[in-house]
């Protein structure tokens, strides 16, 4: 499938392309085989200044996700560095906890949206490198919607909204009064990562808190340790927070983030929005029988989201990744994901030393992975590790953005009757032969069946929207899996795969939340942990606070020919 892409304004495209001299996947030779290096060492460097120093002196070879203009300019000036730029499926946002008063009031969230000066933020913090965004899908998405309700920067309008709704200023405290209680509003906080880990995010929290204080809202920034922050978000113990999503081509992220069924502990509906009209539209998107029906539902859902503001979206950033071109080549820029993101299989497979073969590439990890459990991992830092250990049934061609066969050599999409008069989707996967788990166990259709049923039966929040409609999985033979959904949807093809779990490891795991497979030795194979994948790299060592080391999978089914 190839989704229609929204064309960014030509002027912006030209300016950014000229600024970075970026290359595209079509200009880079890439192969569907690898990996070309013997190991990846991922030094954990949280401090932004230390990251830049390490890259410039050659201590790291891959510096992903640059955001600070000063860092970008320093890298551009380094004759041994190459900076790639790709428009991203990226969205930076302020999230409100709509379960808590007073942030359950639409007016309050709309007023806060009015005091956020996107243009000034982008100019002062990013020197114009980011793209202002108010919509709930980025411009690189084929489902981006431009014409939505907006709350442009206008502090005076924010004051008028609050005054008209009864949030008048208490003369004694200078704080606005909650019309429900007649008392000054309680103090509210904006969680962000720390300045050391994400300086621009922390600074944005401060800027927005100060803008809110200027209209008499008692809001303060609260930078904190990132793993602690994630724990609080999972438990809905927050007022507001600022983070970014790295999305995909598929617009059902709207369902995952905003449908009421996903308002559960550790679920993706972190704002806790519950809106019957919105739910109906999101279900129309999720179960759309065609791209046309999906687009209509997505458009209408985005209008409601823009009006209600469970998030206030600030900007979308191009992915800017730096590589030491004096030492490595073979990195593949990819629309929507960049050249260094874990979703980009092609750089992982194709990166190689300029001289010689094999060797070690040092790939920066900007934050400590909290967990290396595929059922509970949620941050990009965790998946930067895990994403290189697993393969999927399909991959994305980096030039055309079309689906291409991977572990599945082919597939069919059909229908069946879950009950008389009702139509459901059935996906039939035909697997490649010879694929093995990293402990040499053959990968078969039974692994697909076990994984999908385990995720469904255990209601794993990270995957619940993918598996909740699965009725059964059949395995006619070792290389054929048939996944039956109780409903019909254009998108079920993308829910019938995923990060598969080895049954002999996971069948006895009763509590996936507390399972720490990276800390437990494999029961039979020395040197392996219970994090067992089938991808190009094996988890070799994780030394907390120092590094993660991945080694080349010697039995990878796509080894270079």
Q: Where does each model-flagged region fall?
A:
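N-terminal lobe/hinge region of extracytoplasmic solute-binding protein
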Residues: 364-420, 532
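Append "and occasionally in soluble cytosolic enzymes with long acidic Gly/Pro-rich linkers
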Residues: 26-30, 104-210, 274, 293, ...
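Long beta-strand-rich cores associated with HINT superfamily self-processing modules
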Residues: 323-360
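Acidic-aromatic pocket-rim loops
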Residues: 82, 90, 228-287, 333, ...
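Ligand/substrate-recognition segments at binding pockets and active sites
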Residues: 168-247, 291, 356-359, 363-371, ...
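Aromatic-rich, solvent-exposed beta-strand/loop patch
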Residues: 21-50, 71-90, 168-173, 177-187, ...
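Extracytoplasmic/peripheral linker and loop segments enriched in polar/acidic and small residues
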Residues: 122, 214, 218-229, 256-324, ...
């Amino acid at each position: 499938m190839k989704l229609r892409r929204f064309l960014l304004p030509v002027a912006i495209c030209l300016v950014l392309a000229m600024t970075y001299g970026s290359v595209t996947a079509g200009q880079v030779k890439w192969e569907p085989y690898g990996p070309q290096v013997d190991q990846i060492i991922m030094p954990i460097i949280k401090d932004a200044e230390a990251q830049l120093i390490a890259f410039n002196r050659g201590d790291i070879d891959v510096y992903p996700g640059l955001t600070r203009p000063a860092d970008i300019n320093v890298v551009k000036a380094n004759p041994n560095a190459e900076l790639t730029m790709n428009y991203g499926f990226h969205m930076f946002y302020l999230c409100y906890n709509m379960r808590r008063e007073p942030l359950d009031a639409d007016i309050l969230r709309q007023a806060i949206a009015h005091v956020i000066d996107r243009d000034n933020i982008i100019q002062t913090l990013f020197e114009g490198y980011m793209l202002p965004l108010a919509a709930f899908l980025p411009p690189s998405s084929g489902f981006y919607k431009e014409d939505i309700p907006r709350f442009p920067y206008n502090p005076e309008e924010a004051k008028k909204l609050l005054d008209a709704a009864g949030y008048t200023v208490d003369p004694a405290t200078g704080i606005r009064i909650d019309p429900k209680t007649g008392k000054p509003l309680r103090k509210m906080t904006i969680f962000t990562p720390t300045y050391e880990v994400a300086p621009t995010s922390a600074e944005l929290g401060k800027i927005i808190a100060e803008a809110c204080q200027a209209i008499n809202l008692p809001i303060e920034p609260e930078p904190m340790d990132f793993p602690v922050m994630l724990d609080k978000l999972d438990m809905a113990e927050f007022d507001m927070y600022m983070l970014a999503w790295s999305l995909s081509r598929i617009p059902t992220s709207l369902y995952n983030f905003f449908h009421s069924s996903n308002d559960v502990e550790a679920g993706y509906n972190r704002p806790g929005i519950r809106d019957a009209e919105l739910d109906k539209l999101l279900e129309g998107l999720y179960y759309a029988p065609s791209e046309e029906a999906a687009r209509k539902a997505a458009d209408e859902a985005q209008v409601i989201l823009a009006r209600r503001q469970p998030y206030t979206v600030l900007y979308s950033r191009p992915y800017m990744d730096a590589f030491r071109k004096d030492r490595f080549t073979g990195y593949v820029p990819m629309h929507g994901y960049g050249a260094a993101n874990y979703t980009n299989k092609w750089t992982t497979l194709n990166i190689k030393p300029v001289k010689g073969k094999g060797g070690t590439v040092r790939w920066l990890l900007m934050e400590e992975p909290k967990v290396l459990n595929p059922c509970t991992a949620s941050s990009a830092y965790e998946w930067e590790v895990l994403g290189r250990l697993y393969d999927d049934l399909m991959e994305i061609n980096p030039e055309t953005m079309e689906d291409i066969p991977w572990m599945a050599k082919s597939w069919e999409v059909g229908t069946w009757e879950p009950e008389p008069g009702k139509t459901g989707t059935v996906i039939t996967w035909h697997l490649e032969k010879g694929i093995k788990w990293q402990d040499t166990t053959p990968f078969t259709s039974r692994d697909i069946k076990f994984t999908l049923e385990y995720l469904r039966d255990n209601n794993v929040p990270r995957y619940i929207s993918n598996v909740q409609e699965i009725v059964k999985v059949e395995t006619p033979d070792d290389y054929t899996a048939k996944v039956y959904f109780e409903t019909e949807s254009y998108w079920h093809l993308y829910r019938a795969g995923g990060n598969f779990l080895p049954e002999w490891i996971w069948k006895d795991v009763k509590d996936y939340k507390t399972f720490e497979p990276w800390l437990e030795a494999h029961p039979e194979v020395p040197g392996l942990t219970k994090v067992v994948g089938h991808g190009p790299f094996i988890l070799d060592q994780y030394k907390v606070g120092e590094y993660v080391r991945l080694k080349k999978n010697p039995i990878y089914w796509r080894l270079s020919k």
